[in-house]
From Swiss-Prot:
Biological role stated in the UniProt entry: Catalyzes the conversion of dethiobiotin (DTB) to biotin by the insertion of a sulfur atom into dethiobiotin via a radical-based mechanism.
Cofactor list: [4Fe-4S] cluster; [2Fe-2S] cluster
One Gene Ontology MF term: biotin synthase activity
Binding site for [4Fe-4S] cluster: C57, C61, C64
Entry's family note: Belongs to the radical SAM superfamily. Biotin synthase family.
Source organism per UniProt: Synechococcus sp. (strain CC9311)
Organism lineage string: Bacteria, Bacillati, Cyanobacteriota, Cyanophyceae, Synechococcales
Catalysed reaction equations from the record: (4R,5S)-dethiobiotin + (sulfur carrier)-SH + 2 reduced [2Fe-2S]-[ferredoxin] + 2 S-adenosyl-L-methionine = (sulfur carrier)-H + biotin + 2 5'-deoxyadenosine + 2 L-methionine + 2 oxidized [2Fe-2S]-[ferredoxin]
Protein name as annotated: Biotin synthase
Pathway: Cofactor biosynthesis; biotin biosynthesis; biotin from 7,8-diaminononanoate: step 2/2
Sequence ranges assigned to domain Radical SAM core in this UniProt record: 42-267
């Protein structure tokens, strides 16, 4: 029987930097112990992601090709309607996903027909027996409560980077506004999906600082996506080189150590990794992947390649819902 892992919310930046600086084998050994204690049987959740509203976003996030401030080739598109979204959810379920994530390229949710359609999509996804996740920017208390009533499982709202590096990446929304959005989601009884991106010119100290903020949230976010920058032409970060995959492995391992009960999701940038690097990420503590053909506006490995990846790694797909995992 594996011993229970201590859950902490008081990690210091220096402690986290020390973890990030560990020899790789030592770091993986420690992360493995935590991961096996929190994920007996080594299961990986499969999540599918659909962009419901693509492009034309008012925010100026330097990494994002959907921003209207940048010159990428992503143009604004009207929102998808309820029926085709639910058809995509059904297809995702048939392919093996048990979580369906829907994204809107908005600064914030506004009341009206698009929000009513969002509520119908959430209810429809839940009726399929899937977890439903939404990412759509900031929201009000009332909107969070209505999403909860519709059955929303999780709301994604990433920190993106450290408080210190934040203003170099985004100027149209403050770091504090992100924290306030997370609090509204929690108060409504919806689980948090909150992580960040590495490879945007930040320092190791910035990575530690971002993880410190995430780990200080009590309880920890139920899902923590770790993204590697996908540098897209036409964005301010287009010339940044891809990060070393080992840096992503290290980030996932430390995230697992800091937040033992959270799902650590290997997210954007996975399509740039070799199969071997992806397996290292799973070994380091990732227990969820976006599965299928589309990850918002960047590519993602095809379904069969993902199935083969899991077979090669010797892990099982899908285990418990986020709420069941926390209660286990």
């Amino acid at each position: 029987m594996t011993e229970a892992v201590e859950v902490r919310h008081d990690w210091t930046r220096s402690e986290i930097e020390a973890l990030l600086d560990l020899p790789l084998m030592d770091l993986l050994w420690r992360a493995q112990g935590v991961h096996r204690a929190s994920n007996p049987g080594y299961h990986v959740q499969l999540a599918s992601l659909l962009s419901v509203k693509t492009g034309g976003c008012e925010e100026d996030c330097a990494y994002c090709p959907q921003s209207m401030h940048h010159s990428s080739d992503v143009t604004g598109q009207p929102e998808l309607q309820v029926a085709p979204v639910l058809e995509r959810a059904k297809a995702a379920k048939q392919a093996g996903a048990d979580r369906f994530c829907m994204g809107w390229a908005w600064r914030e949710i506004r009341d009206g027909a698009p929000f009513e359609a969002m509520l119908q999509m959430v209810s429809g996804v839940r009726a399929l027996g899937m977890e439903a996740c939404v990412t759509a920017g900031m929201l009000t208390d009332g909107q969070a409560q209505r999403l909860a009533k519709a059955g929303l499982t999780a709301y994604n709202h990433n920190l993106d980077t450290s408080p210190e590096h934040y203003d170099k990446i985004i100027t149209t929304r403050t770091f504090q506004e992100r924290l306030e959005t997370l609090e509204r989601v929690r108060q409504a009884g919806v689980t948090l999906c909150c992580g960040g991106i590495i490879g945007m010119g930040e320092t190791i100290g910035d990575r530690a600082s971002m993880l410190q903020v995430l780990a200080s949230i009590n309880p920890h976010p139920e899902s923590v996506p770790i993204n590697a920058l996908v540098a897209v032409e036409g964005t301010p970060l287009e010339e940044l080189p891809p990060i070393d995959p080992i840096e992503l492995v290290r980030m996932i391992a430390v995230t697992r150590i800091l937040m033992p009960g959270s799902r650590v999701r290997l997210s954007a940038g996975r399509e740039q990794l070799s199969k071997e690097a992806q397996i290292l990420c799973l070994q380091a503590g990732a227990d969820s992947i976006f599965y299928g053909e589309t990850l918002l506006t960047t590519g993602n490995p095809a379904v069969e390649a993902d199935r083969e990846l899991l077979r090669t790694a010797g892990v099982q797909a899908n285990w418990l819902s986020a709420s069941e995992k926390l209660a286990a």
